[in-house]
Amino acid sequence: LIPYLRRFHKDHPEVRIKIINITSIGCAELLENGQAELIVTNYPNSRLSSHTKLQTVLEFRDIFVANPDYFTMGKSPLSMENLLDYPILMLAPKSTTSEYLHQVFAAQGLKLLPEVELNSNDLLIDLAEIGLGIACIPDYMLRNRPGLEPVHLKTPLPARSAVIAHHEALQLSQAAQCFLKYFSQI
């Protein structure tokens, strides 16, 4: 998102931008209540209504990562059931990621019981780096993290996406319309 904000701000320095950093579920609630024109959210997001117009910004996969100094995973991919033998670090229950992971594990007949639940992927990474557990993070966040390695699963988690969304029934401001155009060039 930062490169788009940087470019928009450079092209339109007169526009004041309000940014709120909350969960994807919270973003969807702001959009539905008319408190935000545009949101960037993980998708799928159960709180988005059928009146929400979506534009994909990024496709990604959630991955599990561990510090090999603390967790020797070996070369063989783990089953999801075997993964549950380790302390799992993940985002808090009121997040689309948590909903998604619980659904994926439940589809395999498994109950996901995380050791740690936080509101920050960065903090999950920090805790995984010091060996407190195996963190579930978006794959794009693993870059430049030499102390962490992906945990290979027999069945990789399905891909998801980050989307920019707006309510189709509401008229967007000229600034919001202009900002959306940056994403049509992806």
Please annotate each region the language model reported.
Residues 51-88:
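Flexible hinge/capping segments at coil-to-helix
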Residues 150-186:
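A late-sequence structural motif
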